[in-house]
Amino acid sequence: MRMTMEEMKNEAETTSMVSMPLYAVMYPVFNELERVNLSAAQTLRAAFIKAEKENPGLTQDIIMKILEKKSVEVNFTESLLRMAADDVEEYMIERPEPEFQDLNEKARALKQILSKIPDEINDRVRFLQTIKDIASAIKELLDTVNNVFKKYQYQNRRALEHQKKEFVKYSKSFSDTLKTYFKDGKAINVFVSANRLIHQTNLILQTFKTVA
């Protein structure tokens, strides 16, 4: 049975989403290793990137196996969210124009606020303020994306428009998840949705970096 375009997009999203642990967990490890042995770190990084590309989710499987072997009990989704705020070199836009650097800054700000959710979620007053901050950060990021659209012409504008729509879709999904959370109290669903929004934020940067 042939997949619809929407199903293909969803599968592609799931595939790239499952690779989040590569840059959220392993990249900081590689960066630390570079200080000790640059060559070994670069070789290991390249090997992980290649393996993850060929087998999406492999990094997550390896990490989970290590945790299991060491009998470490950890909420992986929550931990991933806490670590996902760091800049990822592969996603950062290198163009020096203020609009592009502003895009980097606004994306960083949103990711940092989202990554604080596990620390804020059990304090209702603080969490409500965090939700307001997230809404403001989302608006600021979208405003910056629109500013770049106005000032620069792109041959591949369709790809940028598509990624912007995806970001808006996941922003709305995050909002819906929050409404449900206040009814059922299931924090894990908020963490999952926040991770997806961080992933979409990175994809916006990646798309601009690719076509800019």
UniProtKB/Swiss-Prot annotation:
The keyword Acyltransferase does not apply. Belongs to the PDCD10 family. It is linked to Cerebral cavernous malformations 3: A form of cerebral cavernous malformations, a congenital vascular anomaly of the central nervous system that can result in hemorrhagic stroke, seizures, recurrent headaches, and focal neurologic deficits. The lesions are characterized by grossly enlarged blood vessels consisting of a single layer of endothelium and without any intervening neural tissue, ranging in diameter from a few millimeters to several centimeters. CCM3 inheritance is autosomal dominant. GO terms for molecular function: protein homodimerization activity; protein kinase binding. It comes from Homo sapiens (Human). The modification N6-acetyllysine is found at K179. This is Programmed cell death protein 10. InterPro entries: PDC10_dimerisation_sf (IPR046409), PDCD10 (IPR009652), PDCD10_N (IPR048288). The gene is PDCD10.
